[in-house]
Every structure is written in C-alpha cells, then in structure tokens.
Amino acid sequence: MARRPGSSSRGPARSDRLPAEAVTSARKPHAAAPTPPASPDPGLVLLGEFGRPHGLHGEVRLKSHTSEPLAIAGYGPLHASDGRTLELANVRPAAGSSPDLLIVRVKGVDDRTGAEALNRVTLAIARERLGKVEDEDEFFLTDLIGLTVEDGAGTVIGTIVAVPNFGGGDLLEIRPAAGGPTALLPFTKAFVPSLDIAGGKVVADPPDDLFAPPGPKPADDPG
C-alpha cells in the first residue's frame, strides 16, 4: 500500500479479506528502504520477485515486498509473471542478507533446474483479495498507473505508465502527451503536489526539461 507524498502516518488499513497492511507502504522521502514496484496489471499487486537458485534441491532466493517479509507465505497461490500459479513453502530469512531477502521453496519445484527457471519471475496477488483501503491518504501504487498528469495550469503533460523503484524512492514513469520516450519523475510532494485518484489525475510540478532529449556528449567524452 502507498501513501500520498508528504502525508502523515495513520496506521495500517484494515482488511476484510487478506491483510492489505502486509503490503509495504510507500516510504516518505529519504527513507532507506525501497518500496515495491507497481504491477503493470492494475488488477494485481506485486508481492515479490525471485532471484538466483539456492543450492541444488529447488530452493530459490525471493525478495519480499510485504512489510513483514515472511508474511508473503500466507497469501496462498500467487500469480507468477510467467503465467503460472505458484505457492510458497519452507520460507526462511536468507542468512547475512537484508530482511526482505528470503530463501523459499516453491511447491512442485524440486531441483536446481526448476529453481533457475524462476529467476526474475515476479509474484502478485489479485487486488480483489486484499482488503479495502479505508484511509483517504492510502492507496496501492498500482492505482497510479493510467492516471493523467497535469501541470499547475491544468495542461495535460502525459500519462503514468509505471511506478518503478530502483532503491532511491518511488518514481512515476510518464508517457508524454506529445509523444516520444517516457521520463521518470520522483514521486515526492515537491514534484507531485496534488493527487486525485478518484478524478483520474495527478498535478505535477516537473522540471522544464523532463521530456527533453539527451543533449550531445562533450567532445572529450570517451563513451
């Protein structure tokens, strides 16, 4: 779950189905821990991503996006990005690693070959299985995908197509209304002063060169 930039913390939303509060909330600016990326499918919420195999007997590394990393095992069957439905078993922390990195076994995967096939596969849960968000300042990052981006004058400048996070905070990937390559805008109060999910838009204050093409390389640049 995410929180509007600059809003105060009010505690987790309650759930009448699966525990929505287990999904990591968006962090305030400058927080150390990254947040989960939004799913490209608005009907799904990402919960984790597999990494490299661990050993020879089917175990595999998994980066959990839930606020309590081990809680990912309690969601039952999950949607995998390769089209399968997978269920986790024997989940434990990865020794000597960050708290969100786990060693897991997937039901039906019993050897290293099967574990290798999971590398970079993501796990998601159907949004409808999560509880309702009752706090007006909370939402899923998936809710942002498809919203129109306007500037302060009400001019449409683009559409949000993804919400990546590379470790430094959530970013809005915006496809410009005029066409051309997408650009990334930090999802902070300074750059996104207003958010109206119900109205289908955000108001942004981007730098003037947000969609500018890369400039020419300096003459002495060896690249």
Swiss-Prot record:
Residues 1-12 have a biased composition (Low complexity). It is found in: Cytoplasm. Pfam families: PRC_RimM (PF24986), RimM (PF01782). InterPro entries: PRC_barrel-like_sf, PRC_RimM, RimM, RimM_N, RimM_N_sf, Transl_B-barrel_sf. One of its GO terms (molecular function) is ribosome binding. HAMAP family: Ribosome_mat_RimM. The PRC barrel domain binds ribosomal protein uS19. Binds ribosomal protein uS19. An accessory protein needed during the final step in the assembly of 30S ribosomal subunit, possibly for assembly of the head region. Essential for efficient processing of 16S rRNA. May be needed both before and after RbfA during the maturation of 16S rRNA. It has affinity for free ribosomal 30S subunits but not for 70S ribosomes. NCBIfam families: 16S_RimM (TIGR02273). This is Ribosome maturation factor RimM.
